[in-house]
Amino acid sequence: MSLLIEQARYHLSAHNARQLPDDGGYEVAFAGRSNAGKSSALNALTRQNALARVSKTPGRTQQLVFFQIQPERYLVDLPGYGYAKVPQDLQAHWQAFIDRYFRTREALRGLVVVMDIRHPLKDYDLQMLGYAAERGLPAHGLLTKADKLGRGQQMQTLQKVKKEVTSRFGDSVTVQTYSGESRQGVDELRAIVGAWLGLDVETTAAE
């Protein structure tokens, strides 16, 4: 499964619904606030240094970016949210596009919400988790930059976030700590994403 995920390659960028790939197969979306570490997480997941561009200017992802692993198997990088200097009407366009994507995309099988472990569960994070809950989709909270905290603080934050998401969304949301720098939690994330993409079944059959 890990080797399959490492085959991910840039496929296309969609600025509107007409530019999306055909709605079939399997997609796992990644969402995160600016500077949460979403691009770094995607790069670590796929063992590629520049699959998802790590921007020095937060909030500059202005489209849905599709990375193809196999035909009809995609990782989807959702527009970042933060303090990018863009017009309000463009912000509104992104919001409407994302809303439509979540409500209508049949290929979407799961959502990873990337959060800085030092600043988890902001309004945007809860909104994204809410989208998944409304669709009945599984979601996974990825607490990034775990290496910035000691082990005790990591576990304390992890338990606090787990308790909060369970109270809001039930058992449809799982949570883990993660560090692209130390590769902490990479295998756990791969297992979850691979299962959502149906890669675990194919790998087992091949073995």
Curated annotation (Swiss-Prot):
PROSITE patterns: G_ENGB (PS51706)
Limits of the EngB-type G domain: 24-199
Binding residue positions for GTP: 32-39, 59-63, 77-80, 144-147, 178-180
GO MF, one annotated term: metal ion binding
Transmembrane segments: none
Function as written in the Swiss-Prot or TrEMBL entry: Necessary for normal cell division and for the maintenance of normal septation.
PANTHER family given in the database record: ENGB-TYPE G DOMAIN-CONTAINING PROTEIN, MSS1/TRME-RELATED GTP-BINDING PROTEIN
Protein name (Swiss-Prot/TrEMBL): Probable GTP-binding protein EngB
Lineage summary: Bacteria, Pseudomonadati, Pseudomonadota, Gammaproteobacteria, Lysobacterales
